[in-house]
């Protein structure tokens, strides 16, 4: 494989010295970029874009042509795994993802296959290989998956949810069925991420978008336990380099200590967690990624820079910080404001690495 020219992101995740704080943005390949909208229109629809390796590669690289980002993230969707299990994923205008055959009971769980990453999910691996080739070693490529709990919410609710009553009903009335589903998902995600690593992903991230809707006890049993199983099963070295793993539970700032015990390399923070407090609590065990409020990108450039400076000062001197937003970039943000953000992180962070 090509020598990596910029390994700042990987070094920061492993709490090794860097010259400036590395930065990337969740959903950096997305609808705020006019060029993304053009490519998506060419593909026809969202899943066709995900399933075409050349087009998925194109949208992955688009933000890197605009901004000096320190990592690329595979363009895909967390729902590829449930889709490959045969639940019939489709997108309803204005409603987001839906499944034609949601999981309602243990019998449904028993029928679900564990997808072969090189078969049903082969299009994702083709995209990873294509992107790695086209990156030419400029920056590392991040692979990712949804967490078992987060995937289960979509599979049981039949799509997006605000109250999560359907899955919580299963959790409390039929916990055995939910544990069986989560166990199958943990096995599927482990295979899926390991296949991404073998195909060329140089770091991986597990997105637990909905872990924060659980009580502390339920989070441990129904979300964190299964992420821990995945971390235990991941390839941690490939191509002679360590493959760092980041866990991100949105709304999970109160559980950082428990998350750091999983053996992951880094934790993602949303904007509701104070990064100085997070570093005091777990900074001796894991790197931290985050955590500017994505809505800050609506602010004037001077205010964006001020917020970047505040977060950098909060983390302080030394290693182990990857700058990011606290969740995905919003689709109506001005691309120029994203540029201000990235430039400010590099310029203002230099003093913390001397």
UniProtKB/Swiss-Prot annotation:
Identify the Pfam families for this entry. URO-D (PF01208)
Judged by the first EC level, this protein's enzyme class is lyase
Gene Ontology MF terms in the entry:
uroporphyrinogen decarboxylase activity
One annotated Gene Ontology cellular component of this protein: cytosol
The reaction(s) annotated as catalysed by this protein in its Swiss-Prot or TrEMBL entry are:
uroporphyrinogen III + 4 H(+) = coproporphyrinogen III + 4 CO2
Quick one: which residues bind substrate? Answer: 27-31, 77, 154, 209, 327
Membership in a protein family: Belongs to the uroporphyrinogen decarboxylase family.
| Summary of the function given for this chain in its UniProt record | Catalyzes the decarboxylation of four acetate groups of uroporphyrinogen-III to yield coproporphyrinogen-III.
Q: State how it assembles.
A: Homodimer.
Question: Would you tell me the protein name for this molecule?
Answer: Uroporphyrinogen decarboxylase
Task: Look up and give the organism this protein is from.
Answer: Escherichia coli O6:K15:H31 (strain 536 / UPEC)
